[in-house]
Amino acid sequence: MPARKIILSNDIRVKPTENTLKIGTNKSVDIDGMKVTTLKSTDEGVAFIIEYKGKIIYHAGDLNDWYWEGEDEKENLRMRESYRHIIKKGFENIPKVDIAFLLVDPRQENECGCGTDFFLENVEAKHIFPMHFWGDHKRVEEYIRTRKENIYTITHTQQVFELEGLI
């Protein structure tokens, strides 16, 4: 396993240490055999694609289809197109990931999983963990019931999952 490093988006204001690496959008770095690639976010920071020992982990960060009911339709469609372009381009050579951390944000009401839906229509994911749901576990459970993919149900903060044989 590589030495421990803290990898942050370069727009986060913290004093770097020797174990901190700040990285901008659409960049790749290799850290002791672990490749970390970033994608531009549709909000703040970056999304991460991590490749290590033949496995791929995706963490969406704030990269999402931020479609807000009641907001300007032009802006919603611009955001949707931006998100879809970033996902298609970022994963054009990565058809499958082992773990995906994807947004299911109940503040988006009926569109709470639209970014996750698009991602899963375009990228196969073995293990899917919803995030960014502001403690609204019931809304996430409702969303999961509508999907056929292997989306893990998260019932409380700091819940631990063990995935056998991943690395």
Indicate residue ranges for each PLM-predicted region.
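Active-site-adjacent loop/helix micro-motif of nuclease/hydrolase catalytic cores
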Residues: M1, E69, N110-G113
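Core dinuclear metal-dependent hydrolase active-site scaffold
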Residues: N19-K96, Q159-I167
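A short, acidic, amphipathic alpha-helical segment used as a generic capping/interface helix at domain edges
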Residues: R84-G90, Q108-F118
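Short acidic, S/G/P-rich loop/turn micro-motifs used as interaction or catalytic elements
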Residues: D65-Y67, P106-E109
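Binuclear metal-ion centers of metallo-dependent hydrolases, dominated by the metallo-beta-lactamase
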Residues: T17-S28, T42-E44, C112-I167
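Short, conserved loop/helix-junction motifs that constitute active-site signature segments
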Residues: M1-R4, N93-I94, F119-E124
